[in-house]
From Swiss-Prot:
Localization of this protein: Cell membrane
Segments in the Cytoplasmic topological domain: 47-54, 121-139, 218-237, 293-321
Name of the molecule in the record: Olfactory receptor 5V1
Any single GO BP term: detection of chemical stimulus involved in sensory perception of smell
Membrane topology of the entry: Multi-pass membrane protein
Signal peptide: none
Record's function text: Odorant receptor.
Entries under InterPro entries matching the protein: GPCR_Rhodpsn (IPR000276), GPCR_Rhodpsn_7TM (IPR017452), Olfact_rcpt (IPR000725), Olfactory_GPCR (IPR050516)
A single Gene Ontology CC term: plasma membrane
MF terms (GO), sorted A to Z: G protein-coupled receptor activity; olfactory receptor activity
Keyword annotations of the record: Cell membrane, Disulfide bond, G-protein coupled receptor, Glycoprotein, Membrane, Olfaction, Receptor, Sensory transduction, Transducer, Transmembrane, Transmembrane helix
Keyword Glycoprotein applies: yes
Species in which this protein is naturally found: Homo sapiens (Human)
Record lineage: Eukaryota, Metazoa, Chordata, Craniata, Vertebrata
Disulfide pattern: C97-C189
Length: 321
């Protein structure tokens, strides 16, 4: 009978913002605009880096990968969050929950490692520019990107299997926006010590290690920037580094805070805000931060725009005709 009760759950109820009934439509509008900006900005980056031959460099190769990851992991949860804001039925099937958790953890883990690869790219470009094309060959770039994706995949497989091997004994209400590891561990009626150990271990490998590598890379970059003679050049370089580091601290800070701590310390009502930062806000800010001061991207966008725009002479001839 106990085994039957443990396997009886066929769906989960996502509570999300159910306590804010009067703000449901406002929140839907905010999430919709954020998701629209995320898709638009990241799709533009992918199209630009693929179609412009001048952007076929390691930096933009990694940036294109980052844009694709941001689209995927935002799509894994935000559309469902918007549906639940306007729907009375706020449920997700057991299988749907498995798929959502796997996808989200896969893409978040891959992004953690990819950001470190991007920092390494910037370190070589600024601190060792003469050997940049030799060190960061096409083969190495492909290997780095593939390693990020593979490690993210394996990390997701481990946590998905461990999470859904746990028993769920009747209560199926997830006090969160989507199916994520911490709320499911809290919901489980089994022993989660193995899951917590796995979170801590992978948190060190996928969270803290790449984060520290990024910080060390930017320390070297900043020390090189300080030797730039032009004050204007130093100012622009510092401004770019500061914006990149702001995104890194926001993403890693919220992700590490969410996953790398004991389950007993979780307060899902408070932690929901943190989850919004790295799952909704950061993917929208990435294309802005990484392309705002980038002249190459701006020029490429103008070039693409001019190709889609018909010549004025042809328009005049059509109008006169």
């Amino acid at each position: 009978m106990e085994r039957k009760n443990q396997t009886a759950i066929t769906e989960f109820i996502i509570l999300g913002f159910s306590n804010l009934n009067e703000l449901q439509f406002l929140l839907f509008t905010i999430f919709f605009l954020t998701y629209f900006c995320t898709l638009g900005g990241n799709i533009l980056i992918i199209l630009t880096t693929v179609t412009d031959p001048h952007l076929h460099t390691p930096m933009y190769y990694f940036l294109g990968n980052l844009a694709f990851i941001d689209i995927c992991y935002t799509t894994s949860n935000v559309p469902q969050m918007m549906v639940h804001l306007l729907s009375k039925k706020k449920s997700i099937s057991y299988v749907g929950c498995v798929v959502q958790l796997f996808a989200f953890v896969f893409f978040v883990g891959s992004e953690c490692l990819l950001l470190a690869a991007m920092a390494y790219d910037r370190y070589i470009a600024i601190c060792n520019p003469l050997r940049y094309s030799v060190i960061l060959s096409k083969v190495l770039c492909n290997q780095l990107a593939a390693s990020c994706w593979a490690a993210g995949f394996l990390n997701s497989v481990v946590h998905t299997v461990l999470t859904f091997c746990l028993p769920f004994c009747g209560n199926n209400q997830i006090n969160y926006f989507f199916c994520d590891i911490p709320p499911l561990l809290i919901l489980s009626c089994g022993n989660t010590s193995v899951n917590e150990l796995a979170l801590l271990s992978t948190g060190v490998f996928i969270g803290w290690t790449p984060f520290l590598c990024i910080v060390l890379s930017y320390i070297c970059i900043i020390s090189t920037i300080l030797r730039i003679q032009s004050s204007e050049g130093r100012r622009k370089a510092f401004s770019t580094c500061a914006s990149h580091l702001a995104i890194v601290f926001l993403f890693y800070g919220s992700a590490i805070f969410t996953y790398v701590r004991p389950i007993s310390t979780y307060s899902l009502k408070k932690d929901r805000l943190v989850s919004v930062l790295y799952s909704v806000v950061t993917p929208m800010l990435n294309p802005i931060i990484y392309t705002l001061r980038n002249k190459d991207i701006k020029e490429a966008v103008k070039t693409i725009g001019s190709k889609w725009q018909p010549p004025i002479s042809s328009l005049d001839s059509k109008l006169t005709y």
